[in-house]
């Protein structure tokens, strides 16, 4: 089913992109707290958002009324270098933003599937999200919903009652077990921000997006507004 392409918002430099993204995210959280009293922030991992989180951590917002969680996570403890929780704790949950609560996806001492089930209570309590921040992979994945993965269909099903899924490794990705919020959970918000850099991702998202790509499900849903912020 065709859908109207979302215009990409381009910035002249990555520094400008990071500044703008931080402002958009903190503004959305502040507005949502005024409306709902308490909200969540679903934060993505990876290298691109770290400078955005550094900026957000210095900004004034009603952080004590915000619960931060993750769009997805590797099934590793926060002390692991690849942990998204570790990234968020180092870059966002410091300074002003240290007042925010945190709802993890990974739980130690339980199985992969049990961790996903256990995470759902915290994620559900964090909704509605004031804003959701997502990256997009070169294969069109978002969160840890990868093309060809056995959990993709359930992850994209807006009617599922699951908020968090245990995503197994698959070929070619992911290489490690993951935990991922579902599209149904990620759209419990007024605003989803896609933060992307580089020519390849611009080509992926600019204009008509291949409907077979997982990210197409984000762009064609009508529950939440989507903004795409990009810089080379």
UniProtKB/Swiss-Prot annotation:
<dbReference type="GO" id="GO:0006098">
    <property type="term" value="P:pentose-phosphate shunt"/>
</dbReference>
<dbReference type="GO" id="GO:0017057">
    <property type="term" value="F:6-phosphogluconolactonase activity"/>
</dbReference>
<dbReference type="InterPro" id="IPR005900">
    <property type="entry name" value="6-phosphogluconolactonase_DevB"/>
</dbReference>
<dbReference type="InterPro" id="IPR037171">
    <property type="entry name" value="NagB/RpiA_transferase-like"/>
</dbReference>
<dbReference type="InterPro" id="IPR039104">
    <property type="entry name" value="PGLS"/>
</dbReference>
<protein>
    <recommendedName>
        <fullName>6-phosphogluconolactonase</fullName>
        <ecNumber>3.1.1.31</ecNumber>
    </recommendedName>
</protein>
<dbReference type="Pfam" id="PF01182">
    <property type="entry name" value="Glucosamine_iso"/>
</dbReference>
<dbReference type="InterPro" id="IPR006148">
    <property type="entry name" value="Glc/Gal-6P_isomerase"/>
</dbReference>
<keyword id="KW-0378">Hydrolase</keyword>
<comment type="similarity">
    <text>Belongs to the glucosamine/galactosamine-6-phosphate isomerase family. 6-phosphogluconolactonase subfamily.</text>
</comment>
<comment type="function">
    <text>Hydrolysis of 6-phosphogluconolactone to 6-phosphogluconate.</text>
</comment>
<dbReference type="GO" id="GO:0005975">
    <property type="term" value="P:carbohydrate metabolic process"/>
</dbReference>
<comment type="pathway">
    <text>Carbohydrate degradation; pentose phosphate pathway; D-ribulose 5-phosphate from D-glucose 6-phosphate (oxidative stage): step 2/3.</text>
</comment>
């Amino acid at each position: 089913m065709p859908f109207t392409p979302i215009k990409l918002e381009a910035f002249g430099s990555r520094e400008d992109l990071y500044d703008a993204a931080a402002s958009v995210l903190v503004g959305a959280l502040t507005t949502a707290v005024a409306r709902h009293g308490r909200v969540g922030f679903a934060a993505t991992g990876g290298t691109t958002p770290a400078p955005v989180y550094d900026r957000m951590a210095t900004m004034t917002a009603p952080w004590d009324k915000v619960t931060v969680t993750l769009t997805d996570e590797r099934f590793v403890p926060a002390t692991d270098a690849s942990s998204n929780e570790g990234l968020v704790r180092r870059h966002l949950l410091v300074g002003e933003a240290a007042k925010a609560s945190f709802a993890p996806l990974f739980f130690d001492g339980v199985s992969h599937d049990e961790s996903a089930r256990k995470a759902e209570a915290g994620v559900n309590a964090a909704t509605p999200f004031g804003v959701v921040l997502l990256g997009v992979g070169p294969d069109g994945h978002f969160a840890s919903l990868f093309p060809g993965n056995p959990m993709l269909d359930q992850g994209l099903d807006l009617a599922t009652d699951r908020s968090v899924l245990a995503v197994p490794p698959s070929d070619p990705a992911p290489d490690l077990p993951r935990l991922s919020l579902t599209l149904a959970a990620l759209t419990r918000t007024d605003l989803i921000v896609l933060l992307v850099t580089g020519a390849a991702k611009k080509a992926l998202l600019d204009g008509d997006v291949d409907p077979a790509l997982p990210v197409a499900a984000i762009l064609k849903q009508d529950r939440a507004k989507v903004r795409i912020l990009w810089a080379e």
